[in-house]
C-alpha cells in the first residue's frame, strides 16, 4: 500500500526537489536518446567516452577561473575541453601512424589524468565553493536545481531545432556517404555538428550520471532501439522512449530508497532494457532462435511431405497409406527426424496415422504439390533464364521451395506459362 502512496506522491510534483530531478533527467534522457542515434550510426561510440573523460579538466579550469560552482562556467569549460579532445583525436590519428582507437585511448587517459590533478588541487585550495565538485566523477542527480532545468531545457530545444533542420542531411550522410559526396553535401560540417552535439550533451549530462557513466546514457538507448528497428525516424523515437523511461525509473528508485544513487540506477534501467531488447526484440537472440527452430521444423515437415507424395507419384497412388520403412527406403532420413516430421504433418492436418501406416490428407496432397511445383518450376527457370546446366539447379531449388510465397509463385507462372516438365523431364504437378 505504501508503494502506491509513494507512486502517487512522486507523480504529484508536490516536492520541488523531486520535480527538479525528474524533469532534469527526463530532458537529459530525451536529448541523449536523440544524440545517441547519430553517434551509433556514425560509429562514434568511443569518441563519447573520450569526450566524457576529457571534460573533467575543463570543468576544473572553469571553477578555478570563476571561483564559483556556476553551471555556466563549468559547462563552458567542459565544452571547450571536449572540443580540444575531439581535435586531439583527429590530429593524432591524421599526423601519425597511430590508429583512431589508440588516439582516443591516449586522449582519454591524458585529459582525465589532468582533470584528476586539477580536482586534487582544487580540493586542497581551501575554497569553500568547491564542495560537491567531485560529484561530477560519479554524478549526483539530487544536486539538480531549477537553474539547471533552464540549461537542460535550452539544450533540448537546441537538439529539437537541429534535428528537423538537418534531418535529411543527417540521413544522407549517415546512410549513404557515397551519395552525399555525389550531391556535394558538406560531410565535414555534418560530422562537426554531430561532434558538437556529443560535446554539449556530455558536458551538461555528467552532473546527473557522472563522467564514468555518461557514455552509457548516450549509447545504450540508441543501441537498444536498433534491435527493434532500422528506420532512422523510428529509432530516434524508440531511443528517446527508452532513455525517458529509464530516467523516470532511476529517479523513482532513488526516491523510494534515498541511499540509492539516481545516475547509476538510470544506467541500470537502461541496461535492463538493452538486455531485454538483445534477447526478445524481433532481432534478438531468443527471437532468432525461435524463428530458426520454426524454419528447421518447417523444412523437416516439408521434406517428409515431399517424400510421402513422391512415393505415391512414382506408383501413381498418392492417397495410399505407407509404412515408416517405405518412407525410409525411398529416401533415408534419420528415424527420429522422420518421426518428428510425421508428427508435425499430423498436427498441421497434412497427414493422418492409421495404425502403423501414414497417409496424406487432401490438404497434404495439395501442399505437397505446391512444394514440388515450386521446386521444379525454379529448376526450369534457372535453366531457361539463367542458363544454368540442369545438373546444377537442384540445390538452389531445395532452398527456394521452402521460402517462396504464393505471390512469387504466381509471378513465376505468369513469366513461364504453365510448363509440363522440369529440366529432368519430371512432371510439374498443378491443382486439378
Can you describe what each PLM-predicted range is?
Residues 1-30:
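Membrane-interfacial amphipathic/re-entrant helices at transmembrane-helix boundaries
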Residues 22-27, 75-80, 105-106, 149-154, ...:
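Hydrophobic alpha-helical transmembrane segments
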Residues 38-52, 56-126, 225-239, 253-260:
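Short loop segments and helix-boundary regions at transmembrane helix junctions
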Residues 107-162:
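Transmembrane helix-bundle core of multi-pass membrane transporters
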Residues 161-194:
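Membrane-helix/interface signature in polytopic inner-membrane proteins
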Residues 262-310, 406-414, 418-429:
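Membrane-interfacial segments at transmembrane helix termini in multi-pass membrane proteins
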Residues 293-333:
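Short amphipathic alpha-helical interface segments
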Residues 317-432:
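Structured cytosolic domains appended to multi-pass membrane proteins
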Amino acid at each position: 500500500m505504501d508503494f502506491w502512496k509513494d507512486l502517487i506522491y512522486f507523480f504529484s510534483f508536490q516536492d520541488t526537489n523531486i520535480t527538479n530531478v525528474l524533469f532534469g533527467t527526463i530532458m537529459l534522457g530525451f536529448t541523449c536518446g536523440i544524440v545517441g542515434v547519430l553517434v551509433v550510426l556514425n560509429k562514434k561510440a568511443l569518441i563519447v567516452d573520450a569526450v566524457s573523460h576529457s571534460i573533467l579538466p575543463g570543468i576544473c579550469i572553469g571553477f578555478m577561473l570563476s571561483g564559483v560552482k556556476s553551471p555556466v562556467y563549468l559547462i563552458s569549460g567542459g565544452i571547450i575541453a571536449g572540443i580540444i579532445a575531439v581535435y586531439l583525436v583527429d590530429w593524432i590519428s591524421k599526423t601519425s601512424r597511430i590508429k583512431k582507437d589508440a588516439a582516443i585511448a591516449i586522449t582519454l587517459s591524458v585529459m582525465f589524468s589532468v582533470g584528476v590533478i586539477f580536482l586534487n588541487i582544487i580540493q586542497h585550495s581551501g575554497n569553500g565553493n568547491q564542495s560537491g565538485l567531485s560529484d561530477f566523477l560519479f554524478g549526483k542527480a539530487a544536486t539538480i536545481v531549477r537553474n539547471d532545468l533552464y540549461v537542460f531545457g535550452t539544450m533540448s530545444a537546441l537538439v529539437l531545432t537541429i534535428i528537423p533542420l538537418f534531418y535529411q542531411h543527417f540521413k544522407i550522410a549517415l546512410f549513404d556517404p557515397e551519395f552525399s559526396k555525389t550531391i556535394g553535401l558538406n560531410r565535414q560540417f555534418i560530422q562537426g555538428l554531430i561532434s558538437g552535439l556529443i560535446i554539449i550533451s556530455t558536458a551538461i549530462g555528467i552532473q546527473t550520471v557522472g563522467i564514468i557513466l555518461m557514455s552509457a546514457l548516450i549509447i545504450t538507448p540508441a543501441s537498444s532501439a536498433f534491435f527493434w528497428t532500422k528506420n532512422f525516424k523510428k529509432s530516434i523515437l524508440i531511443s528517446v522512449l527508452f532513455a525517458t523511461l529509464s530516467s523516470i525509473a532511476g529517479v523513482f528508485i532513488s526516491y523510494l530508497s534515498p541511499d540509492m544513487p539516481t545516475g547509476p540506477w538510470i544506467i541500470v534501467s537502461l541496461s535492463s532494457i538493452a538486455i531485454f531488447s538483445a534477447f526478445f526484440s524481433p532481432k534478438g537472440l531468443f527471437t532468432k532462435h525461435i524463428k530458426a527452430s520454426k524454419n528447421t521444423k518447417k523444412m523437416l515437415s516439408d521434406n517428409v511431405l515431399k517424400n510421402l507424395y513422391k512415393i505415391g507419384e512414382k506408383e501413381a497412388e498418392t492417397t495410399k497409406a505407407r509404412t515408416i520403412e517405405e518412407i525410409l527406403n525411398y529416401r533415408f532420413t534419420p528415424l527420429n527426424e522422420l518421426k518428428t516430421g510425421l508428427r508435425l504433418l499430423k498436427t498441421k492436418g497434412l497427414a493422418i496415422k492409421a495404425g502403423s501406416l501414414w497417409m496424406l490428407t487432401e490438404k497434404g496432397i495439395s501442399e505437397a504439390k505446391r512444394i514440388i511445383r515450386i521446386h521444379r518450376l525454379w529448376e526450369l527457370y534457372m535453366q531457361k533464364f539463367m542458363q544454368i546446366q540442369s545438373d546444377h539447379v537442384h540445390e538452389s531449388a531445395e532452398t527456394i521451395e521452402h521460402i517462396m510465397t504464393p505471390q512469387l509463385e504466381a509471378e513465376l507462372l505468369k513469366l513461364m506459362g504453365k510448363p509440363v516438365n522440369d529440366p529432368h523431364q519430371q512432371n510439374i504437378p498443378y491443382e486439378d
